[in-house]
């Protein structure tokens, strides 16, 4: 994976079309900004129950976006990351519909995770309470088969997303078939979506248990055999992230976004500096994604071990996002929106900072200086604001940060002072040789955060005074960049 900034985007929501249009945009108005693209699910269909994360067929490109030839053509310009949705398939998939029609006589009957597979002797109330689930509601569904019987099936996320038994013959073959298709299209990295929920075992939380680590290691090996790196997507306790990072190619730094907000809101960089001292260097760093802003990643463990932030600090963080977004994030979070996520605040990162340009650039500068490969979400690239109209149409909280851009909007955004300055930061991160060297984090006598990269005679340094709302970048090659935001 190139050590350069990557773009995260839905193919159609940024380009207004398919893969050919996205390629034209990257080769045109966005030329030189991104070394790679995480193309969010482009499988058939892209407009299912979960915005592409519930494909009926993971091996088919939605024809509205193009074909695998178009994916391969884009791979000739930039590295491509694609999602391998590990945990589930659509209830509308041909495999599940065959199971509905034929029951145990279906050749795909073993592909789906039933209650009985995990609990062959039944489950106590405590067994069920132990199961970790990120959303409200029942984790099981009881569809009626056409032959008249019912089966209790795992549905970790929604009733439309049926969990796979990844150890079954058809489940394993399904995942390997997707890997083969990715490799044929020259995909260079895969993101294992919802991987932490893949293994179910009685007496456990059924989330990131020992057997999950073993499964991920084997799946990652299969991907590497096909020439692809592996990124694991898991929202979890920060120590778990460090452990996961030692076993895979890449892991998300999901603690970074809330810690930066906390520092900007309070003027205190202590927690952020402590995290940057121990955070995995093989990380993918983000501020925003297609999901909300996570808080579980900085919280305490369920067994009581302390997190990166105290509970009251997390409460303040969430309330401050709601305040700075003028209540819009509250309308998109928790009980106010469907697809409930218990650990995320739905809001654009720009709105979470009260649309303060300098605070936003300070946050991006910290991200670009943090260890790892930075990814920038398409809405964040354009300084996007909360899409209240889309939220109102769908009632899905995360749609507040999933805007459909028109060409004119993109042109206007690219001409804005904010996006021009952000583009300068991206180009600096992509081209300065110091970012291929060694990283150091410190705090100076004034409490400012100091992030440094050094490679032989090349250097780049970011100094952020959160108490003054000011940041300065100095680097070899006469680079100098100063910006001041709102004082907390």
Swiss-Prot record:
**Pfam families this protein is in?**
Alpha-amylase (PF00128)
Transferase is among the record's keywords? yes
Q: Where does sucrose bind?
A: 50, 88, 191-193, 233, 290-291, 341-344, 398
Q: Which reaction does it catalyse?
A: sucrose + phosphate = D-fructose + alpha-D-glucose 1-phosphate
Q: Which InterPro entries match?
A: Glyco_hydro_13_cat_dom, Glycoside_hydrolase_SF, O16G_dom_2, Sucrose_GGa_phosphorylase-rel, Sucrose_phospho
Its Enzyme Commission number(s) read 2.4.1.7
* Coiled coil start-end: none
The UniProt entry, under Gene3D superfamilies, shows:
Glycosidases, Oligo-1,6-glucosidase, Domain 2
Q: Which GO terms describe its biological process?
A: carbohydrate metabolic process
What broad class of enzyme is this?
A: transferase
> Looking at the keywords, is Cell division present?
no
Swiss-Prot/TrEMBL keywords: Glycosyltransferase, Plasmid, Transferase
Protein family membership: Belongs to the glycosyl hydrolase 13 family. Sucrose phosphorylase subfamily.
Protein name per UniProt: Sucrose phosphorylase
Lineage at the top is: Bacteria, Pseudomonadati, Pseudomonadota, Alphaproteobacteria, Hyphomicrobiales
